């Protein structure tokens, strides 16, 4: 139950971001470096995703027989096709910003170090024109909060059944991440 409660709290955060917090604004994510799992899902919940060239993206959950449960399928489908969504979610490899741009998953790739300026440029010059189009995108392909809730319930049920080998692998990956920070 605790896992489900925490998962639903994460869903609330990405859903509110996707819905622009109920305000007339555009949410933008800037990706610098590796963007994996839940971090990638959080970025995808923005209306606009800008990445620096060296950024890499992926869903490593498949390595431990899980799938990303915080909206990956829902958000990728609203940017691309079911085929691309399934390819991304079932592949543990990291993909470059350029590859993500080609697949239609992100909106803009800029040189390393130019991300903050690109976000400012977008907000100053392109956002006023794009706001209406982004609203149309949400209308044509709406996201119902229940969709995210149902997926997180499936994720929790799946996570509760993972085996010891997968738990050990997760532990090793967490330990390696901790060494990086």
Regions found by a protein language model. Give the residues of each.
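Short, small-residue-biased leader/transition segments that mark boundaries at the very start
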Residues: 3-4
């Amino acid at each position: 139950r605790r896992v489900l409660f925490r998962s639903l709290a994460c869903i609330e955060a990405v859903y509110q971001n996707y819905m622009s917090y109920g305000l007339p604004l555009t949410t933008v994510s800037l990706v610098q470096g590796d963007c994996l799992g839940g971090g990638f899902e959080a970025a995808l919940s923005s209306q606009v995703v800008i990445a620096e060239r060296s950024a890499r993206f992926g869903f490593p959950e498949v390595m431990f027989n899980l799938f990303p449960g915080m909206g990956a399928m829902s958000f990728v489908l609203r940017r691309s096709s079911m085929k691309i969504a399934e390819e991304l979610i079932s592949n543990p490899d990291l993909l470059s910003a350029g590859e993500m741009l080609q697949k239609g998953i992100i909106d803009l790739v800029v040189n390393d170090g130019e991300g903050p300026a690109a976000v400012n440029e977008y907000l100053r010059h392109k956002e006023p024109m794009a706001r209406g189009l982004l609203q149309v995108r949400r209308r044509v392909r709406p996201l119902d909060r229940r969709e995210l809730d149902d997926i997180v319930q499936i994720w929790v049920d799946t996570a509760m059944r993972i085996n010891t080998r997968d738990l050990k692998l997760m532990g090793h990956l967490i330990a390696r991440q901790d060494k990086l920070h």
